[in-house]
Amino acid sequence: MKVLRTYYIFLLSSIVISQENEAIKYEDLYERKGLIYASDQDSTFNGTVNENWPTGIKKLSYTYKNGKPDSKWSDWFNNGQPKEEVEYSNGIKNGLHKKWYKNGQQKFERTYKNGIHDGKWTEWYENGQSMVEGNFLDGKPDGTWIYWYPNGQKREEGNPVSSDTSSLAFLNDGIWNYWHPNGQLKETGNYISGEKDGQWFEWHDN
C-alpha cells in the first residue's frame, strides 16, 4: 500500500507539472477590468508567453505578474532581427524602451520611470544617422534638444517645454537655431511658450 500511495502522489505531481508547463499562446489571454487572464484560468495570469513565427524564428516573449506586464517584453521581426524591447514593473513602463527597423538599425531608445519619461531620449533614421537627441526630467523635456536631417546635418536646436507629462506636444522656448540641409544657418531667434518673440534673423542657402 505504501508503494501504491507513493506512485499515486507521483502521478498527481506529474499531472500538475504538465499543466503548468503547457504552452499558453498570446491569443489565449484576455483582459478583464484592466488585468490579464488565461482563457482556462479564474485567477490573474502569471508567467511568460513565448511565440514563434511559422519558420520557427522567435516572435515574442511577454511576462506577466498578477495579470500585469512585468520584466522585459521582447518582439522580433520574421527575419530574426529584434523589433522592440520594453521594461515593465507592475504593469507600467519602468526602464528602457527600445525599437528597431527591420534592417537591424535601432529606431529609438527612451527611458521611463514609473510610467513617465525620465532620462535620455534618442531617435535614429533607418540609415543610422541621428534624428533626435534630448532629455526628460519627471516627464517633461529638460535642457537642449537637437534634431538632424537624414544626411547627418543639424536641422534645429533649442529648449522645448511642456506642462503635460502625458503628452509629447512640446512648445519651443528661448533661443532656437535652424539650419539648411547643406549645413548653413537658416534662422535664429527667440520663443516664448511657442510664440516667436523679438527680432529673428534669416539666411538663404547658397
Predicted regions and their residues:
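Glycine/tyrosine- and acidic-biased, solvent-exposed loop/turn segments at the edges of beta-strands
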Residues: 16-206
